[in-house]
């Protein structure tokens, strides 16, 4: 049985249409996840990112130091983030981030992990979508550039966000 990772690797690390309507890049491993995140930070020029995060998973994969550097780089670019986090409890580092959310240019909603189980982190800054699956055994990231997809994922984020904002 062939899995998705093998199929993607077999065809290419990058898929794009001739008209440039979509670009999909696959990044494998911890270093690949970091590289995809760095590309997203560089290319996604919007001033507000909308994200679904499971920081515990990312924290376990790359550590708090690397994650903190990334947050600082985002803040240096003056990019705000609207973050939806499914959790009841957090590590001391995440508690500190939540406590100092204004410093980190964050708006955060905590949601039930039972109602909104997130196995992946998703960041949207049109036309970009970054998807990170940070499982220890086989972490990977997909970096997708496609306006209709980013608008759709952003709409889903807005629906969840607005549910808790009202």
Labelled PLM ranges:
Residues 1-4, 81, 101, 150-160:
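Charged, low-complexity, helix-prone segments enriched in Lys/Glu/Asp/Gln
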Residues 1-23:
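Short, charged amphipathic alpha-helical surface segments
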Residues 8, 37, 71, 154-157:
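A generic alpha-helix structural signal
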Residues 11, 18, 43-47, 82, ...:
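Short secondary-structure junctions and interdomain/linker hinges
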Residues 28-145, 149:
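Hydrophobic protein-protein interaction segments
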Residues 140-166:
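Signature of lipid phosphatidyltransferase scaffolds
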